[in-house]
């Protein structure tokens, strides 16, 4: 394994990804970040909250920080994109978080296996079905303040999976975490794409595929796609630049993409349990 890594490690830059706030000596939603990473979302953990990052993911363990509500408010006022979990929401919603948004996490649950996706939170334009029902917490929210980007569908009802709120110059996204973290893998690809987009707002690389495909990004335009699936899988890669190509760092193969406005879109095949290493050129 190490011999194969030696073939490309020198061509990688410094790792990038959505900043994760993991305070020292904290716990809560333990190991959730591992599951999020398996959804194709690159993460970079930090023990302190750094306002230099534009995208910041905060899970329940951050409730150990007694100033977390104030810190989130300051991040949003400065124009940052903050993503929190339903676990953190429930832990801090009675500690002043209602001054930021009126979304609340209740004790009620819902089983969902149908998902609806909205581009802007106004109408649902995609419906997808998961392989099994997923048990999620139910959120309460006011429609004039919050917008559902992904929703789980019930019987004549719907439940937020990804909800967006605006505050100051920034955006707050709340991600619904199933009772069983492993059920995140059953969120269908159509639901995972807007979740990845929320974590990677204005980032250079975004993938569209099923779960158990991980993405590792670097500051020199290189990235790794790693599959943990037992079968081949197509991955759509969007590079937020026009007129770029990809080169496979290991094989030297060049890949041409499809121009779509100021973006370039590539479709690549990943073999079972394997990886591909690319760089923009």
Roles of regions detected by a PLM:
Residues 1-42, 174-176, 182-185:
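Hydrophobic targeting/anchoring helices
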Residues 5-17, 47-49, 163-164, 214-216:
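Short boundary motifs at domain starts and secondary-structure transition points
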Residues 17, 53-54, 81:
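Short, surface-exposed connector motifs at secondary-structure boundaries
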Residues 21, 53, 275-278:
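Aromatic side chains
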Residues 33-54, 60-63:
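A short, well-structured beta->alpha microelement
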Residues 60-281:
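A conserved amphipathic helix/loop scaffold
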């Amino acid at each position: 394994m190490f011999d194969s890594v030696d073939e490309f490690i020198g061509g990688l830059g410094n790792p990038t990804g959505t900043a994760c706030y993991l305070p020292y000596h904290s716990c809560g939603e333990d190991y959730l970040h591992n599951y999020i990473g398996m959804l194709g979302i690159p993460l970079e953990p930090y023990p302190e909250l750094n306002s230099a990052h534009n995208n910041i993911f905060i899970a329940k363990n951050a409730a150990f920080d007694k100033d977390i509500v104030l810190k989130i408010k300051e991040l949003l006022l400065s124009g940052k994109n903050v993503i929190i979990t339903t676990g953190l929401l429930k832990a801090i919603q009675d500690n002043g978080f209602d001054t930021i948004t009126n979304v609340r996490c209740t004790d009620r649950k819902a089983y969902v296996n149908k998902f609806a996706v909205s581009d802007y939170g106004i109408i649902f334009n995609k419906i997808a079905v998961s392989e099994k029902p997923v048990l999620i917490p139910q959120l309460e929210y006011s429609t004039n303040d919050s917008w559902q980007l992904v929703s789980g569908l019930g019987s004549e009802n719907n439940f937020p999976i990804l909800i967006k709120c605006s505050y100051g110059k920034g955006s707050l996204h709340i991600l619904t975490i199933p009772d069983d973290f492993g059920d995140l893998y059953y969120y269908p690809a159509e639901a995972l794409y807007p979740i990845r987009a929320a974590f990677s707002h204005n980032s250079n690389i975004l993938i569209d595929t099923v779960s158990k495909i991980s993405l590792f990004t670097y500051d020199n335009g290189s990235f790794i796609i790693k599959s943990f699936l037992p079968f081949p899988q197509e991955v759509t890669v969007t590079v937020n630049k026009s007129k770029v190509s990809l080169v496979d760092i290991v094989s030297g193969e060049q890949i041409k993409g499809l121009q779509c406005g100021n973006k370039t879109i590539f479709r690549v095949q990943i073999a079972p349990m394997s990886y591909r290493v690319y760089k923009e050129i």
